[in-house]
């Protein structure tokens, strides 16, 4: 599918399984939609008209709003920081836009040139409706062209959710473009796909494979799905209204949903080389969409990695606990002298280590499999779970040595 077959299409059996589940869950969710419509049609079709963008979407205090046209597609992005500094490319998730990084742009721009992109189909970027225009090979080539158009040969990529999946794929397909990868609330694509059956939104992911109906469902009850995903924002919050403005039309949903309609059908080739550049995986300890086990398994695809847990955060740690998140991000991205002990940069916060251990040991459902993964990664160094040393455990989650 893509250059050198690093990103490939899943097996025929997987494709058949996805389409079969699409039919089953599609019928089920459409029946639920019909029941809600019959029960309360007025509420179901409520959609507030939003003609004027909230000030925060067009405010230039976070940076300059710019546009670039690549392969016939217009991309919108916000840029901040000196052009002489290393580039950090921020890729938002779903349902979101460049504004997702409002707490990170001011902090990062003190050390980096920051570009917060509206992905194709989102925000003020073009929104082609065709599903094929969101094929992963096309998306990656456009990101490659974007980085080149910014006048650099490589950059640090920070991606959340869908943006994280694209970051993983970009690091595999065009490793020369990525200096460092930060994946926020996002496991490796192969782990993401194989762990979907344990995800709380598994039915929805299969439902969105259908045409038209998922877009209609997203608009019901005044774009209720936005409030569902952004629970950390209070009702009538300025930023919540900004998101509702950005997703208040049917065509505002087709592009974003097309990512899911394509990403479920791809994987990184098993013979693909592990990612050589440093990878930082950041997740909230209360994320119901992403399991800690999937984050740990994702390190199998990395040569150098760090795993960081944001205490008290769900799926949007960079917004919900932005101060703690920014501290982790800066510590990971801004170069500092490593400790003398083998060049390994240990976590500065013992509290984070304890929370990580607590998250694993207290989660009975998948704790054993996580610890098994840890055991494999240490080649038997951690031999007995009851006597595991917290500092050794921290080192496993911060493998930054060569």
Predicted regions and their residues:
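Serine-hydrolase catalytic-loop signature spanning alpha/beta hydrolases and amidase-signature enzymes
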Residues: 84-85, 95-103, 114
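Flexible "cap/lid" subdomain of the alpha/beta-hydrolase fold that forms the substrate-access gate
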Residues: 2-66, 72-88, 115, 122-158, ...
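N-terminal cap/lid subdomain of alpha/beta-hydrolase-fold enzymes
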Residues: 106, 117-120
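Active-site helix-initiating loop/hinge in glycosyltransferases
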Residues: 93, 320-321
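Recognition helices and adjacent regulatory flanks at domain boundaries
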Residues: 100, 119-122
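Short, hydrophobic alpha-helix immediately C-terminal to the catalytic nucleophile
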Residues: 99-102, 168-172, 326
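A short, Lys/Arg-enriched amphipathic alpha-helix followed by its capping loop at the start of a domain
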Residues: 103-112, 149
């Amino acid at each position: 599918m893509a250059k050198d077959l690093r990103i490939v299409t899943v097996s025929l059996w997987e494709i058949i399984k996805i389409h079969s589940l699409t039919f089953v869950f599609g019928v089920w969710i459409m029946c639920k939609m019909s029941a809600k419509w019959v029960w309360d049609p007025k509420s179901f079709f409520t959609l507030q008209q939003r003609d004027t963008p909230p000030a925060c979407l067009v405010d230039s205090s976070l940076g300059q709003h710019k546009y670039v046209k690549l392969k016939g597609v217009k991309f919108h992005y916000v840029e901040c920081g000196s052009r002489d500094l290393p580039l950090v490319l921020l890729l938002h998730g779903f349902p979101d836009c460049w504004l997702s990084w409002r707490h990170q742009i001011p902090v990062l721009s003190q050390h980096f040139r920051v570009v917060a992109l509206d992905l194709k189909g989102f925000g003020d970027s073009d929104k082609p409706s065709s599903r094929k225009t969101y094929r992963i090979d096309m998306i990656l080539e456009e990101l490659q062209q974007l980085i080149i158009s910014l006048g650099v040969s490589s950059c640090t990529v920070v991606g959340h959710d869908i943006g994280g999946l694209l970051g993983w794929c970009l690091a595999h397909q065009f490793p020369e473009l990525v200096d460092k990868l930060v994946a926020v609330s996002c496991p490796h694509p192969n782990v993401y796909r194989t762990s979907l059956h344990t995800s709380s939104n598994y039915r929805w992911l299969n439902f969105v494979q259908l045409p038209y109906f998922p877009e209609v469902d997203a608009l019901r009850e005044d774009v209720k799905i936005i409030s569902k995903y952004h629970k950390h924002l209070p009702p009538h919050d300025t930023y919540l209204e900004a998101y509702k403005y950005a997703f208040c039309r049917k065509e505002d949903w087709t592009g974003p949903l097309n990512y899911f309609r394509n990403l479920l059908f791809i994987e990184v080739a098993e013979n693909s080389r592990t990612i050589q550049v440093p990878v930082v995986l950041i997740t909230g300890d209360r994320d119901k969409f992403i399991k800690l086990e999937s984050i740990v398994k994702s390190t199998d695809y990395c040569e150098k990695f760090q795993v960081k847990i944001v205490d008290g955060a769900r799926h949007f740690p960079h917004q919900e606990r932005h101060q703690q998140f920014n501290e982790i991000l800066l510590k990971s991205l801004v170069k500092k002298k490593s400790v003398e002990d083998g060049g390994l940069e240990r976590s500065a916060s013992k509290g984070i280590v304890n929370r990580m251990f607590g998250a694993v040991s207290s989660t009975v459902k998948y704790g054993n499999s996580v610890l098994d993964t840890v055991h494999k990664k240490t080649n038997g160094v951690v031999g007995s779970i009851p006597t595991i040393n917290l500092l050794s455990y921290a080192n496993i989650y911060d493998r930054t040595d060569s």
